[in-house]
Amino acid sequence: MDITDRFADLVRGPEDECRIDLGAFLIAAHANRGLDVDDQLHRLDDLAMGCPTPTLDGVCEHLFGVVGFQGDTEDYKHPRNSLLDVVLDRRRGIPITLAVVVMEVGRRLGLDLAGVGMPGHFLVRDRDRIAATAMRAKLN
């Protein structure tokens, strides 16, 4: 199936079935027509398998502390920072692509993570932890 058709099918489907990792790699495949999207998805699987602690903090420690992912402070606006395959290769990216890596590694570990858009930033939150905190606040 054509990359554009595959992307269109993905975003037309139910929201809860719209996988961010697949969408990001399909976008990257437009820049690199030889990109094997399924191979790229397996790279995220491998990152998840290497994570010893299945928590948001554990994923962040693994990706940023052990594997060496970091923000690209030298050439922040370069388009390669928006291509998930290149971010995996370089272990450098912008907040939104790094957040996609965190969320998708977390999803593979059974975590319920979500992206949070902020002015000039993109953050990741653990839905379970926030829900538990909100419940405690209501009970106290």
Identify the residue ranges that each predicted region occupies:
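A structural boundary/capping signal
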Residues: 1-140
